[in-house]
């Protein structure tokens, strides 16, 4: 049931992370899973339909080779693919899987940055930990950690009347229409005001 998950989400995440950091068996289970699932990571194998494009087989091979090279250039350099500039594409995949295994969720935002001479690619991926997806305080009476409160979007805001469960807004049919991502982590000591 929804209540079992939402009301205990924060505790489950804390325990999973504690086990990962303190119990070698749990650490090995997650790391082995990561290695077996991700392996060498996703790679691009371009294959264009040259007949639809009206190009010769040589032109198709040339385009495919160029596309694969561009992908490798983007994916291999952490400044190219990671919004925080910390991981290359393979490491982002590993991070996302580990976060999902420990937290039950992980979110990836696609961001655009201005191209630069040494960094011509504008697309960056930003991995968001599940903890940052939470119900805004003005929806839930001031409590957000774990975000388990079943809240309703207030009148005057887009989506008024929709329900919010643990930072996920759903319409009357149960379709996900929005995610509320906080700019800070729960219980983070900061002078920054928490916003969604």
Protein language model annotation of sequence segments:
Residues 3-6, 28-30, 46:
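Intrinsic disorder/low-complexity signature
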Residues 1-18:
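Intrinsically disordered, low-structural-confidence terminal and linker regions
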Residues 32-196:
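Structured, mid-chain assembly/scaffold modules that mediate subunit interfaces
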């Amino acid at each position: 049931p929804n209540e079992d998950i939402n009301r205990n989400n924060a505790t489950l995440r804390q325990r999973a992370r504690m086990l990962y950091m303190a119990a070698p068996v749990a650490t090995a289970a997650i790391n082995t899973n990561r290695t077996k699932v991700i392996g060498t990571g996703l790679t691009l194998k371009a294959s264009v339909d040259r007949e639809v494009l009206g190009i010769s087989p040589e032109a198709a091979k040339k385009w495919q080779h160029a596309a694969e090279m561009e992908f490798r250039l983007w994916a291999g350099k952490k400044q190219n693919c990671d919004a925080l500039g910390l991981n290359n594409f393979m490491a982002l995949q590993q991070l996302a899987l580990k976060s999902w295994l420990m937290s039950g969720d992980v979110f990836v935002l696609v961001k655009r940055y201005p191209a630069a001479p040494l960094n011509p690619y504008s697309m960056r991926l930003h991995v968001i930990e599940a903890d940052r997806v939470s119900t805004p305080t003005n929806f839930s009476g001031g409590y957000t950690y774990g975000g388990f409160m079943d809240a309703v979007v207030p009148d005057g805001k887009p989506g008024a009347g929709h329900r919010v469960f643990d930072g996920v807004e759903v319409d009357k049919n149960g379709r996900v229409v929005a995610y509320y991502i906080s700019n800070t982590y729960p219980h983070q000591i900061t002078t920054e005001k928490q916003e969604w």
